[in-house]
Amino acid sequence: MRFCLFSFALIILNCMDYSQCQGNRWRRNKRASYVSNPICKGCLSCSKDNGCSRCQQKLFFFLRREGMRQYGECLHSCPSGYYGHRAPDMNRCARCRIENCDSCFSKDFCTKCKVGFYLHRGRCFDECPDGFAPLDETMECVEGCEVGHWSEWGTCSRNNRTCGFKWGLETRTRQIVKKPAKDTIPCPTIAESRRCKMAMRHCPGGKRTPKAKEKRNKKKRRKLIERAQEQHSVFLATDRVNQ
């Protein structure tokens, strides 16, 4: 009787060991299949056709699409155009919803724009907004040089004189209100000049120089000659009519 009980106990123990061995063997085979399949790397649950369906705790689940096929992956960081969204059940890669964004911190805050676009306060622009200047080294919009309003046009002058010439220059200016964030960013023009007609061509009480007198006399002689030629032409025309 004792021998029968002892034999039965051995059979039960062997069955338990066998079941445990079979379970361990199944788990080892499952882990081995994960390792042998590249898309199952980092997965807690994976299939050959659909890839990962659950990821390890610190990894992000990403649903990759290739043509008509899609499969899950577990990644340490999300690819371009996606950001990592952590959640209690499983971390996921979510798509950036910002136009022309290459990498983002969240769905509405970009950290890097696509080529040809400038980053400004979490958005991407092809041209920086007013008051900001493009910094090509980092493709960001930084605070530019801010200037005030133009002053009124100054007095028309030439050689620091306001008389004695027919034409002169008048100038207006504006002040730099805020310096740019980078010294390499230029400021707009803060002074500009234009041609103007002087109010007084001859200075009061001034004496004309010999050169000015000669020029004036030449002009008078030229006008007298032109007038005489006109009168002579009229005389010839009248004479022909009378003949």
From Swiss-Prot:
GO terms for cellular component: cell surface; extracellular region. One of its GO terms (molecular function) is signaling receptor binding. Residues 1-23 form the signal peptide. SUPFAM superfamilies: Growth factor receptor domain, TSP-1 type 1 repeat. Keywords: Developmental protein, Disulfide bond, Glycoprotein, Heparin-binding, Secreted, Sensory transduction, Signal, Wnt signaling pathway. Residues 144-204 form the TSP type-1 domain. Disulfide bonds join 40-46, 43-52, 55-74, 78-93, 96-104, 101-110, 113-124, 128-141, 145-187, 156-163, 196-203. Its main location: secreted. Residues 204-224 have a biased composition (Basic residues). Glycans are attached at residue 160. It is found in: Secreted. Activator of the canonical Wnt signaling pathway by acting as a ligand for LGR4-6 receptors. Upon binding to LGR4-6 (LGR4, LGR5 or LGR6), LGR4-6 associate with phosphorylated LRP6 and frizzled receptors that are activated by extracellular Wnt receptors, triggering the canonical Wnt signaling pathway to increase expression of target genes. Also regulates the canonical Wnt/beta-catenin-dependent pathway and non-canonical Wnt signaling by acting as an inhibitor of ZNRF3, an important regulator of the Wnt signaling pathway. Probably also acts as a ligand for frizzled and LRP receptors. The FU repeat is required for activation and stabilization of beta-catenin. This is R-spondin-2. It comes from Mus musculus (Mouse).
